Each structure stands twice: as structure tokens, then as C-alpha cells.
């Protein structure tokens, strides 16, 4: 009898141990006992009207991996563009950018964003892309390095205080509230100016749901942990955009990078005050901007001129702020730029005049419909004509015989507006925005037609391409089931198999120039 009782007890204990083993989470690669869940389970991608929409959710490792995996093709193509574009324009090879980004920024961005960046590299590498964390870091920092750090090195070498930066991403933006808008709430709009060979790839919409901090809806670029051209809506009620300060000079190697400050401020702020505090914390001067920010909860808007020596804030609940790459304050102009404020014919000043005209002409009427029209505006106040140019809010430098000398863009340079976004308080409350790819005026850029007329830019042929305009499209934060609800299965990529085969060939050196024509992407 005693033996049978002992036997039963042993069976019970064995069963209990077995059940504990079954429910215990298996060890992950690091042996930390975490669940081996599918890292893509909460993420998806869908393509719509020229935009690539991705939903990312989880901790920094997860959202990084999701990002890299879902945008592997686009990250690979963008990385290859930078490897050829930056040596041509800055005379510095990609390895310089990798080394500089790591030395200047890696330790400063903290554990969370280090993990996210490493995750992006791992996700893309899982799809066959030859990439590591330093590549992703350098991509995030390329504006700060190419347009601020490199000129600062030249300035130091030449001992010339007049050497200026010519930041490539330049924008036309506004924010208005109170008696200036149709219903008294905030309206915000922005379009992005940059070289078309880069800007045609600035077509990502990210619904970011991090494990900590605010949920963010933003436009972005492949591989970026931030928006880059900067248009954000957060579930804390903040609405954020900016325009770059033309001919800003100076770079502080000990300062905090802009891409880190804007991501941290946007993710962890629930008010204008808390957002400003992060943005003004040790700026390095890289990507120095005039920031426009609104709080839909209060209707208040603000502008931050975010330099190194000068951080000047204006706030109102009844008014507007506009941006077209002009430095606002005389002290900033004098101390931190080489900008000629007396020249009213340059692009920044001409667009500033046009913005003020549009605001005053439409006081009390500004809404989403007008915001879209503003961002597509083609009136040139210098030439006094209706035709896209380097002086119009919707920029077309490719047809401008003067180019943009203040940005070092020569005559007919293939650059200008590459996308546009607008939102108001009502949309922001629903975490939603309207966006269009390409020129918001509806004009298409056709590369071969352009190169026939301007063969001096033939060097861009291998890394550039057409940039068609897309219809204005509304985007919102969405659940994974969205695809099933509208009859489309969310895909990891519309051309998974062929892409991975092409990536394998590049890695092995067989047929390295092979390109895979994409199949038509799924449409929502």
C-alpha cells in the first residue's frame, strides 16, 4: 500500500513539473526566458496611392525589426542611393558617414533608440539586405552630417566663418488657430522640398504604437526612426511640423542630434511645454529648424526657432505661424546664419511673402480644403505670375532658370516639393491626416524627359526615377484587421520572393545589377 501511495505521489509531482515546463516561456536567443512570439504578429504593410503604410507595435526591438522587415526593399534602395549620391555631392564616401554617425551619435541616443535602430538592421538583414546598425544610424543622421557637420569641418579647415550649410530638405508650412480658421480649431499643413532622387522615396506613413510613450502617426523615409521632413500627430494631442533655417551655420559635436530629440520629444510629451523642453536640450545645430507645434486640446500653437545659441519661442491661441526656410528673428540671423534678409527675391523670402498674403486673404476661412490648396500654390510673388518655380509654395526648381543659389542648387536642378500633408484638430483627435505624394499641384516629374532637356544631370540617372503625383489620401491609425475588413490581406511585401532572390544575388555577387519589376501592390 505504501509503495502504491509513493508511486501516485511521484506521478502527481511529475505531472506538476511537466505542466510547469509546458507553460514556462522558452528561452530566446539571449536566454532570458521571453516568449518566442512572431515579431511581425502585430505589424502590417499596405500600399495606397503612392504611399506605403506600415503599422508598428511593441518594444523597441520589435518595432525596429518590423520596420526593417516590412520595408526591406525600400531601405536597400535608399541605402544604395545614399552610397552614390553623397560621395557626388559632398565628396565623402559612405564609410565616412557610418564612422561619423557612430562616433558622434550612437552613445547619445540611449538604449531605446539603439535597440530600435539595431532592430531595423536585423529586420532588413532577415530579408537579405546587406546592412548593419551603423548604416541605419547614418541614414537617420545623413541630413545633419552632410549638410551641417561636413560644412563645419570645411569651415574649421579654411578658418572661414562665412562657410554656410545648405540643408537639402526645405519646406513650406503653416499652422493657424482661433479667428484665423473656419471653426476656430488648429489647421496645419506642410510640404517637403528635396532632391527628387531622394524625395521620390519619402513616401512612408507610419502608425507607431510603442510600448512606452505616445502613439504617433507620421510620414517618414525608409529606415528612419523619425519623420525626417517632420509631420506628426500624436495621441497626446500634439500636431508638429517644421521648416529648415536657410544658411544656418555652426555644429556642436557634443550636442544632441536632431533626429533623436524630435523622436523623444514627440513620443514622450503631452504638452507644448514638455515638448519644447526636450527640443531645447543641448541642440547640436544639425538640421536647425523653425518648429511649428499645436495642442488640439487647448487650441494653442507655438513656434520654436531652434538654433544653438538662440532658442526663441512664440505662442498664441489666436493667430498663425508660417515657415518657408526663412530665419524669423534678427538675432538668429545675425549670430547663426549667413542668410541675406535684405534680399526679398530669394526663395525663402518670396514664399514668406506669399504665406502672409494667403493667411490674410483667408482669415476666418482656413480649413483642410484651403490647406491643400495652399500647399499646391503656384503664385510667384517675384515674377508676379502663376507658374511653379523655386519661389512658389509648391516648389519646381527643375523649371527655374535661376535654380536656388542659397541652397547651392544650380539652374533647373531636379528638386522641389515631393509630398504634402495637412491636418486639423478634428482629424488629429481621430489620429488622422491627409497626404499626397509627389507635387500636390498634380504635376508629374518624368526623369527621361527632363534629362533630354538637361543632360548636365545625367549623373543622377542610375539612382533617380519618375516622381508621379498621387491623389490626396486620408490615413489614420488602424488595427491589423483593416486589410481583411476591406478585402485585402496585409502583406509583408507585394513582391517578397523575387526581392529576396535579387538580394541573394547581390550578396553573392551574381548578376548584381538585377532589378526586379514590382508587381502591382495591394490597394486599400
Place the predicted regions along the sequence by residue.
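Extended amphipathic alpha-helical segments with heptad-repeat/coiled-coil character used for oligomerization
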Residues: 300-340
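Bacterial N-terminal signal peptides that target proteins for export
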Residues: 2-13
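Bacterial N-terminal signal peptides
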Residues: 12-21
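N-terminal mature-domain region immediately after signal-peptide cleavage
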Residues: 27-273, 280-286, 292-315, 344-524
